[in-house]
Amino acid sequence: MYIFKQPKIGGAVTDHIDGTFLQVDPINHVMGVWIPVDDATLENGCLWFIPGSHKVNSVDYRFVRTHATESGKPLLTFRGEKLIFEQDKFVPVPIKRGSLVLIHGLVAHKSEPNTSEKSRHAYTFHIVDAHNTAWCKDNWLQPTEDYKFPNLYDN
């Protein structure tokens, strides 16, 4: 995914854990990768994390595929109780362009709006250690006959 926070109007990304959107068992087998194309600063909406939150969070709130609509498209919804994070525990993580941030599937993170005169571009994607890992059948994103998730390597 390519993220582009435009100057002055690039919005916030609300606090969340990636496990809400990508449920696997065991959950520690999902990892986000975030690569800034521009320096990510306090002013242009750098990432914020709650340190150590991956050790205490669980996935009780999920974005899931429920069933197909009459047109055959999947119906997506949130299930469960959303975690409420203490906002004063978030710590900003300004980072230089070209760096790499690894994001555990249970760590609480967010970003603030871009209030600067400069854009903030970033690439992000998620990887799953598929070895001995179950991909939940109600995840919003599912492989199909036409599109299989690519393997980065084989064990």
Each model region followed by its residue ranges:
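Glycine-rich loops and low-complexity Gly/Arg-rich segments
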Residues: 22-29, 38-40, 57-62, 72-76, ...
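Intrinsic-disorder/low-complexity, polar/charged segments enriched in Ser/Thr/Lys/Arg/Asp/Glu/Gln
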Residues: 30-32, 90, 100, 122
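Glycine-rich, charged/polar anion/phosphate-binding loops
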Residues: 17-20, 34-35, 87-89, 107-110
